[in-house]
Amino acid sequence: MAECNGERCGGPVILAGLVLGLGVVQLASGPLAQTSRFSLELLILLVLRLVGPMLLALLALALLLPRWLERVQRLGTEAWRTSTPAAAVVGALLMLLFFVAAMCGGVLASPRADLAGEIRDLLRGVLLLDLSRACLRAGVFLGLVCFWSQWRMALGLRLERDPGLLVSDQLAEGLVLLLLMKLVWITVLDPLTLTASPQ
């Protein structure tokens, strides 16, 4: 199940990561006239601490909702027992894929000619703890939103609601849930702080 979810989300996640990496570095090094190293550090901060896990979970939510509904139709209220752990694992792995894609996009967009030095600076700015937390956060976000969505869709099917409307409703509810989880995470569980990378 996790493998099927990953295959469905892999391509869009890679594309989203590349677009984010290219966009952030081009903006920072172009109109904002920042150094190449600062641009990459900004990209790392955005991907790992601010927008990465939530953006990834939202993208996966939109792609996987029809499959989650299908499992609820087949398995009823028991669907979450297999879907939720699978979604959590997929969320963590996709976060790693998203991070690599964003970093590749950032390096490609960098105006610096020394590619080896660019990669060295990039790796120097990545803290393993931050990467692990981002993967954990993405897994928790996607797992919880999967549980919520399947529980709500099971209730809707009992009331004989239209499946298309159920998917639409859960996309909206999932977005709100993700925003609330993000708010709790950055204010209570893991407040945002800036850590200087080694020189």
Task: Please describe what each predicted stretch is.
Residues 27-51, 101-143, 147-169, 192-199:
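Membrane-interfacial helix-loop-helix connectors in multipass membrane proteins
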Residues 1-7, 160:
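Cytosolic juxtamembrane amphipathic/interface segments immediately preceding
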Residues 46-65:
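Long, hydrophobic alpha-helical segments
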Residues 92-109, 147, 175-185:
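Bilayer-spanning, highly hydrophobic alpha-helical transmembrane segments
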Residues 36-39, 62-75:
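Transmembrane helix boundary and interhelical loop/hinge segments in multi-pass membrane proteins
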Residues 68-85, 160-163:
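Short cytoplasmic-facing helical segments at TM-TM junctions of multi-pass membrane proteins
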Residues 10, 14, 64, 80-101, ...:
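Selective transmembrane-helix segments that form parts of the transport pathway or gating/packing helices
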Residues 8-30, 176-188:
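Hydrophobic alpha-helical transmembrane segments of multi-pass membrane transport/permease proteins
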